[in-house]
A protein has these predicted regions:
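A short beta-loop-alpha structural element at the N-terminal edge
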Residues: 8-22
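Conserved GNAT-fold acetyl-CoA-binding loop/helix
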Residues: 21, 25-48
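Conserved beta-strand in the GNAT
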Residues: 60, 66-75, 91-96
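Conserved acetyl-CoA binding element of GNAT-fold acetyltransferases
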Residues: 83-99
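C-terminal "cap" of GNAT-fold acetyltransferases
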Residues: 84, 124, 130-134, 141, ...
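Conserved acetyl-CoA-binding loop-helix of GNAT-fold acetyltransferases
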Residues: 97, 103-116, 140
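Conserved GNAT acetyl-CoA-binding A-motif
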Residues: 111, 118-130
Length: 161
């Protein structure tokens, strides 16, 4: 991906699964090495990705180099947002960017696609949870810290623009 080529964001298909699983594992290893433990990689496998593909909840960012980023977008998140009203928000999870493409707008493109999808679904908000070390990234992308869950997970919310 040259610096001028914006990533193309689309709903993932079954042919993307292996590449997405590798990308998520690589991202989790990188975050863990930086002191920002991510999701449980043992749970990130083909079955995990297939579930999101079947529900059209897995987005990928791609360019001439292949898949360079991904995330999930769901209609609910009972673990971190149990009291949320159904339909008031969409929930972004598992945002991962190939390290060779960090700083090139991949996260921004994925988040903008999630915002658009949330609006299309009639949701007023896009929410996520993240490690506190990642709050700055999301705040720079327009999100606001809402709460801290269990002392270790920042709950981040964003109103639709």
């Amino acid at each position: 991906m040259d610096s001028e080529e914006p990533p193309n964001v689309r709903v993932a298909c079954s042919g993307d699964i292996d590449e997405v699983v590798r990308l998520m594992h690589d991202a989790a290893a990188w975050m863990s090495a930086k002191g920002t433990p991510a999701w449980d990689v043992a749970r990130i496998d083909r079955t995990f990705a297939e579930t999101f593909v079947l529900r059209s909840e897995l987005l990928v960012a791609s360019c001439s180099d292949g898949i360079v980023g991904c995330c999930t977008l769901s209609a609910e998140d009972p673990e971190f947002w149990p009291d949320a009203l159904k339909g008031e928000a969409a929930y972004l999870h598992k945002l991962a960017v190939r390290r060779t493409h960090a700083g090139r707008g991949v996260s921004s493109a994925l988040i903008e696609a999630c915002r658009h999808a949330a609006r299309t679904q009639g949701c007023a908000k896009l929410r996520l949870d993240c490690h506190p070390n990642l709050r700055g990234l999301y705040e720079r992308l327009g999100f606001t810290h809402v709460d801290t869950f269990n002392g270790s997970v920042a709950k981040i919310g964003g109103s639709q623009r």
